[in-house]
Curated annotation (Swiss-Prot):
Can catalyze the hydrolysis of ATP in the presence of single-stranded DNA, the ATP-dependent uptake of single-stranded DNA by duplex DNA, and the ATP-dependent hybridization of homologous single-stranded DNAs. It interacts with LexA causing its activation and leading to its autocatalytic cleavage. It comes from Sulfurimonas denitrificans (strain ATCC 33889 / DSM 1251). ATP binds at G65, P66, E67, S68, S69, G70, K71, T72. CDD domains: RecA. Keywords: ATP-binding, Cytoplasm, DNA damage, DNA recombination, DNA repair, DNA-binding, Nucleotide-binding, SOS response. This is Protein RecA. The lineage of its organism: Bacteria, Pseudomonadati, Campylobacterota, Epsilonproteobacteria, Campylobacterales. It comes from the Bacteria. Pfam families: RecA, RecA_C.
Length: 345
């Protein structure tokens, strides 16, 4: 760049800094590019699938799927992991259905969890904006988009037509929120439901999510959660096998997926993942129905090994660290150390 252009640019940058604050416009090379920080999901496999060791901080994340597929459980598990790392979390319970006892079982520190049960959508999103602007919150969970009912719809008659009102509300809120979240390094998780497209014929998925298209565009990560099998002990159902697929990912390659167990009353079974990934990565030896770790016999059958890990936390932690090291989760994984296809269960 010639001297006159450089002088004009420097003058313009000074004017911008004076008008909008220092750093409003800067050269990319003037600032060190930091790796994207993440919050663990509580699932080793999903942390791997997301590519950075969890969901990105300072971004919008959407978790969606059919009813009873594990959406809220996953969001609460992320909340627990964030709190364990010293973060402050808020839960916007638009559905008025938060089970405090279940959240506690998942490891959520309910005494220090900020909770709001808003009366209508605008109130919920105003609360989100206010606490995000404070800079004191690390994670906000909104359960759910479908329950963010506009005030006009609540105060109107059942016969009133309110076409597109919620979509406009979401679009306006996300336009305001994205910049604030990035600046304050606050993550917002929107839990969403799916609906069937009316008159859908031919190619493409007949499913869509509620709240319009804005969330699809503004979300840095979208996770599709589906129940794929029931886990039984004898005749009793004790949990679900769940598949989580990363449909959109702006911070790592998308379309990776992970499977894990969600046990009723307990949440994501980390012990089950230790068994599955330990075997896949040759950290745990499997011979027939028997499992062993080095010279240590772990037990016969997957459920017995899970029970062993629940009893022996030191052993479980040792194996977990080895799995994380093999996956590359120890240093904000680059995905070069292990192909997701090698560990997709």
């Amino acid at each position: 760049m010639d001297a006159n252009k450089q002088k004009s640019l420097d003058l313009a940058m000074k004017q911008i800094d004076k008008a909008f604050g220092k750093g409003a416009l800067m050269r990319l090379g003037d600032k060190e590019i930091m790796p994207i920080e993440s919050i663990s999901t509580g699932s080793l496999g999903l942390d791997l699938a997301l590519g950075i060791g969890g969901i990105p901080q300072g971004r919008v994340v959407e978790i969606y799927g059919p009813e009873s597929s594990g959406k809220t459980t996953l969001a609460l598990q992320i909340t627990a992991e964030c709190q364990k790392a010293g973060g402050v979390c808020a839960f916007i319970d638009a559905e008025h259905a938060l089970d405090v006892g279940y959240a506690k079982n998942l490891g959520v520190d309910v005494d220090n969890l900020l909770v709001s049960q808003p009366d209508y959508g605008e109130q919920a999103l105003d609360i989100v904006e206010t606490i995000a602007r404070s800079g004191a919150i690390d994670l906000i969970v909104i359960d759910s988009v479908a329950a963010l009912t506009p005030k006009s719809e609540i105060e109107g008659e059942m016969s009133d037509q309110n076409v597109g009102v919620q979509a406009r509300l979401m679009s306006k809120a996300l336009r305001k929120l994205t910049g604030i979240l990035h600046k304050m390094n606050c993550t917002v998780i929107f839990i969403n439901q799916i609906r069937m497209k009316i008159g859908m014929m031919g190619y493409g998925s007949p499913e869509t999510t509620t709240g319009g298209n804005a969330l699809k565009f503004y979300a840095s990560v979208r996770i599709d959660v589906r129940r794929i099998a029931s886990l039984k002990q004898g005749e009793s159902q004790i949990g679900n096998r769940v598949k989580a697929k990363v449909i959109k990912n702006k911070v790592a390659p998308p379309f990776r997926q992970a499977e894990f167990d969600i046990m009723f009353g307990e949440g994501i079974s980390k012990e089950g993942e230790l068994v599955d990934y330990g075997v896949k990565l040759d950290i745990i030896d499997k011979s027939g129905a028997w499992f062993s770790y080095g010279e240590t016999k772990l037990g016969q059958g997957r459920e017995n090994v899970k029970a062993k890990f629940m009893e022996d936390k030191v052993l479980a932690h040792e194996i977990e660290e080895k799995i994380k090291a093999a996956m590359g989760l120890g240093d904000l994984m680059t995905m070069d150390s292990l192909d997701i296809e090698d560990v997709d269960l």
